[in-house]
Regions:
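Copper-binding active sites and cupredoxin-like electron-transfer domains
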Residues: 1-141
């Protein structure tokens, strides 16, 4: 059957050791620190968003993804069509990958970030800008 149609995106969670001391100086989603904080990802309300998330962070054993304003279904390694959980935060070890599926009901600016203060302060933070879609949302959903 496959997965339902969705607006899809990829997050490569990584860090940058700019002084080669074996510790990351910056963190980010898709390499550029703070990029999605200054350039929010535009999405439509009431439409399924599918994020392919890969933790390629070096020098730190775990990373995580926290989403504000809604919850997501997650699929470890993307190997099943049945979600293994429904949450707003996910912790991943090095090399781990997940598929996250979520929707926003209301328009607005919604933050996503690492749930590690150091990572967020050094660049792993961003936002989704949810805009009204043409779809009508039923309170029954």
């Amino acid at each position: 059957e496959g997965r339902a149609p969705a607006d899809e995106l990829v997050f490569m969670l990584n860090g940058l050791d700019t002084d080669f001391d074996g510790e990351n100086n910056f963190y980010g989603a898709n390499t550029i620190p703070f990029y999605y904080q200054h350039h929010p990802i535009e999405i439509s309300t009431n439409e399924l968003i599918r994020a392919y998330v890969v933790n390629i962070l070096e020098f730190d054993p775990v990373n995580n993804f926290h989403l504000h304003g809604t919850l997501f279904h997650h699929f470890p390694a993307g190997t099943d069509t049945v979600p293994s959980g429904f949450n707003d935060m996910l912790t991943m070890s090095q090399g781990e990958r997940e598929i996250l599926e979520f929707e926003y009901k209301y328009p607005g600016l919604y933050m996503f970030h690492a749930h590690n203060t150091e990572f967020s302060e050094k660049g792993w933070v961003g936002s989704f800008l949810a805009k009204d879609s043409e779809k009508n949302y039923s309170d029954e959903n």
